[in-house]
């Protein structure tokens, strides 16, 4: 009994592992929708800020820069709702109503939360908020959402809302309410239920999320401490995991918290903290006591609180036009009771409330968002006056806590460990007077230990720009000379894609499934080293999407050109170092293990060779009548997918064969394509989609019969093995000529209005890729067979939306509605279908006067789908018959003639 239970449990795990991976892959596809707009938003931010910050006082130029910048600002400020809408649409079969409902859900949820978030002190003399039983919740836990003070759930909240909305949509989109409130039935009910569910979700988040926010801050702090004390180990670990998750498509879900939330660091915690700086090369700490006068370079603006002795922070008042000596004199006499906060310094440097604006737009939390926030804040490159009389320029290094003590002391911004730090007795002499103030460095710690702007993204640049192209060159040169051109066309374009756009999958997938040890043991390790060295050597190169050359110029070279110390020069240095490892390693291992990378390995099967093999199969068919051609081809497909034991799930739609396998390394895509697939795609590493046109469902059924034991697999394999052998083929006997009906009339299967195929919103039908015919806009849901007598249901799709009929040897396809395959896509065999009530079975014969082949709930179908119905004579029949339309427009009744098919060999 115990053994049986273990087997059942293991079988359950294996069955659900594939579906979980598909779900995660779908989640990542959803995350990519908002992430895809970030590059352009980042360009708007970068270019807009560059124009605005260098406007030289020209109002029109500054306004234009701000105009461009705000286009990017709005995207980053609203990332959570973008994630919510994207996830909702992804998991609801691209339903626009689901996206709308997600927005309603998000807005109402945040409105409910805002009413229960109470400031600790309404007069703002104390910071923080009280939320239910949480007291003095820090500002970093709160964000401005749609103009409301709400919990800063960031992209996590967006994903939660999107997932719940998708669930509610899929559950209620077809709901029928009593007639008295029938207006709210169907999809109109979805936003209503979302608004209702937003209440308990808001309360649950208020009960839990403040603790989550605190935990995220602790994670960020822990990673920062690991980075500061562990020589960049946080980036090393991150780099490997991020690359290792690429095959599973879940890397977006992994890096999103570190890029976009306080887990990647937060500047909000130092808003009201004193500004202490340890300048490069100094062995002491100083206070910031002012900033350079905008109107008079070389002169300083001193906060009135520091100059006049008012207790507390400066509260906006300033004394302008001070030289450093007089500024220090004022400060020395009053310094002990006053300090300048980071919020005040940022606002003073930018002459506006820029700190609050950055917080409102969510640009003070997360490694990448902080980089963007600093980039557009207006404080980088600005000078401040220190309490030792020297000036200091604010750069990325002010906040970058990255490097070990043997070449730098990490971030320049510090905070006292506890209490008031003691001043060094002998102050530095300025202008002959000991009127400066310095402090003991041992009493300070890094202000934001968890922060190094862009530390979780910049590591991509060296290996994407230089490392991968070097590996690609090695793989090209490892191919035989006669096939290097072939290898270059595939590998070269993939490597160039990595360089220009930072999209690496085309290159990585050329060897990932062929040699996973090369991916995980070499490539992912070198990617981790790239992240580690960029962090360790104190780089701060930003990005919005990936490590592309475009991002390198915009967020590395340009900031360095402005003196902001992004240290982008490290990218080519580290990249060349990695290339010296990538090239010989990939070259040697490709040859040593004879990896069948593009241009290497076994001889590629040509189309000519495939046709010859197919002819041999037809020859064998004459000597073994136990198997038809479809079964033989299905057997070959089954082998191409690694055998029946490698099939985890098998399905098909109107044109695509969908196969989930257990081990993707066993799949031979070349054979699948040579068997007629127009293309083979992967949406997850184990999920293959092969485009076979209308043969997809036929192959699916035949393969399923083999897997279920309905076909003798042992005998079929003998036939397949014989086709692969070199024995002499028997003589091909002439194919007997069958009697063919000269003219065949196809009848309308339903009442409705005729439309040309050009009006069908599906390129497959509009462009007549599978055949020719007409479209019918049905007026009722009673569909009948398209002939008077002996109409065979050649194929009935399990989703109930499409059928292929055999009318006297002519294949005719009926496809009810557009994209309607989605309605019952998740139904298991035997489950009752929605919308479609199928009355016929595959292989059955029916007549026009018998009961309908399918009854359709047309009202329910129209709620979400276009009911226009393509009625197509398949291309395989058009090869032998000429189609002559009888009716092409206007109303049509069921049973009325639509086409006449004339046999092409008919003698006139």
Swiss-Prot record:
- Source organism (scientific name): Mycoplasma genitalium (strain ATCC 33530 / DSM 19775 / NCTC 10195 / G37) (Mycoplasmoides genitalium)
- Region annotation (Unknown) maps to 265-450
Gene3D superfamilies hit by this protein? Glucose Permease (Domain IIA) (2.70.70.10), Glucose permease domain IIB (3.30.1360.60)
Keywords, sorted A to Z: Cell membrane, Kinase, Membrane, Phosphotransferase system, Sugar transport, Transferase, Transmembrane, Transmembrane helix, Transport
UniProt-recorded name of the protein: PTS system glucose-specific EIICBA component
**Membrane spanning residue stretches:** 31-51, 71-91, 100-120, 155-175, 189-209, 459-479, 487-507, 509-529, 536-556, 571-591
Query: What are the positions of the active site?
Result: 653 (phosphocysteine intermediate), 815 (tele-phosphohistidine intermediate)
Q: Which reaction does it catalyse?
A: N(pros)-phospho-L-histidyl-[protein] + D-glucose(out) = D-glucose 6-phosphate(in) + L-histidyl-[protein]
GO CC terms, sorted: plasma membrane
Briefly, what is this protein's role? The phosphoenolpyruvate-dependent sugar phosphotransferase system (sugar PTS), a major carbohydrate active transport system, catalyzes the phosphorylation of incoming sugar substrates concomitantly with their translocation across the cell membrane. This system is involved in glucose transport.
Pfam families (alphabetical): PTS_EIIA_1, PTS_EIIB, PTS_EIIC
| Domain PTS EIIA type-1 residues, every copy | 762-875
InterPro entries in UniProt: Dup_hybrid_motif (IPR011055), Glu_permease_IIB (IPR036878), PTrfase_EIIB_Cys (IPR018113), PTS_EIIA_1_perm (IPR001127), PTS_EIIC (IPR003352), PTS_EIIC_1 (IPR013013), PTS_Glucose_EIICBA (IPR050429), PTS_IIB_1 (IPR001996)
Question: EC number(s) for this protein?
Answer: 2.7.1.199
Q: Give the record's membrane topology.
A: Multi-pass membrane protein
Comment text on domains:
The EIIC domain forms the PTS system translocation channel and contains the specific substrate-binding site. The EIIB domain is phosphorylated by phospho-EIIA on a cysteinyl or histidyl residue, depending on the transported sugar. Then, it transfers the phosphoryl group to the sugar substrate concomitantly with the sugar uptake processed by the EIIC domain.
List residues of the PTS EIIB type-1 domain: 631-713
Localization terms from the record: Cell membrane
- Domain (PTS EIIC type-1) ranges: 1-264, 451-602
Q: Which SUPFAM superfamilies match?
A: Duplicated hybrid motif (SSF51261), Glucose permease domain IIB (SSF55604)
Q: Name one GO biological process term.
A: phosphoenolpyruvate-dependent sugar phosphotransferase system
EC class name: transferase
